[in-house]
């Protein structure tokens, strides 16, 4: 009896480990696709926002969900459209991003409050959370790295603004003080960029 009980816990641990690795690999692959196809990703997220808006309107018309919950959901989708304007470059300190994070919390609070008072089967509650609360923030979360330069980029020496100002576009001539400053800059603050 105890041996089978021990085996069941061991198998549960192994299954959770495999599921975790599969989800991590899937998220990694999804992030790679998003980085490669940012225009298509932006279009897909836009369609997801429109779909979520249609679901919210359908819940209001057919299911008589509370006006406050639907109104906050529609306003959140409007904020998501604002985030989509600068996609894939999402600033974590922008008011739009901070507002969207706050609205996600407010939406969850309103949903928990509503579903605590009204009975709905678990599958319907999960459908609401999936389509109206989770799918769009998850898409933005997975695509956060799309705006970053993950791999080091290449540049020619003196390709920055200061070098162009001092040399006035003359690549062959280097001023003495500029060489010293370039050396100090690379010694103190080495860049990740390869210089050819």
Swiss-Prot record:
Domain of life according to the entry: Eukaryota
Family annotation (InterPro entries): Svp26/Tex261
Membrane topology: Multi-pass membrane protein
A GO BP entry: positive regulation of apoptotic process
GO molecular-function term, one example from the UniProt record: COPII receptor activity
Keywords of this entry: Membrane, Transmembrane, Transmembrane helix
Annotated compartments: Membrane
GO CC annotation terms, alphabetical: COPII-coated ER to Golgi transport vesicle; endoplasmic reticulum membrane; Golgi membrane
Pfam families per UniProt: Erv26
Transmembrane regions: 3-23, 42-62, 70-90, 97-117, 125-145
Family: Belongs to the SVP26 family.
Listed name of the protein: Protein TEX261
Chain's gene name: TEX261
């Amino acid at each position: 009896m105890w041996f089978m009980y021990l085996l069941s816990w061991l198998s549960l641990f192994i299954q959770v480990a495999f599921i975790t690795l599969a989800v991590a690999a899937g998220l990694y692959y999804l992030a790679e696709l998003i980085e490669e196809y940012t225009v298509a990703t932006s279009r897909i997220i836009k369609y997801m926002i429109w779909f979520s808006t249609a679901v919210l309107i359908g819940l209001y018309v057919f299911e008589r969900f509370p006006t406050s919950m639907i109104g906050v959901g529609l306003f959140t989708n409007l904020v998501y459209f604002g985030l989509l304007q600068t996609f894939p470059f999402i600033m974590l300190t922008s008011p739009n991003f901070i507002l969207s994070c706050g609205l996600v919390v407010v939406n969850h609070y309103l949903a928990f409050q509503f579903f605590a008072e009204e009975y709905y089967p678990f599958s319907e509650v999960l459908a609401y959370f999936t389509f109206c609360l989770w799918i769009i923030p998850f898409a933005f979360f997975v695509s956060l790295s799309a705006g970053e330069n993950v791999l080091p980029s290449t540049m020619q020496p003196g390709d920055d603004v200061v070098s162009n100002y001092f040399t006035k576009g003359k690549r062959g001539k280097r001023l003495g003080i500029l060489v010293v400053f370039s050396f100090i800059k690379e010694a103190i603050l080495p860049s990740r960029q390869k210089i050819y």
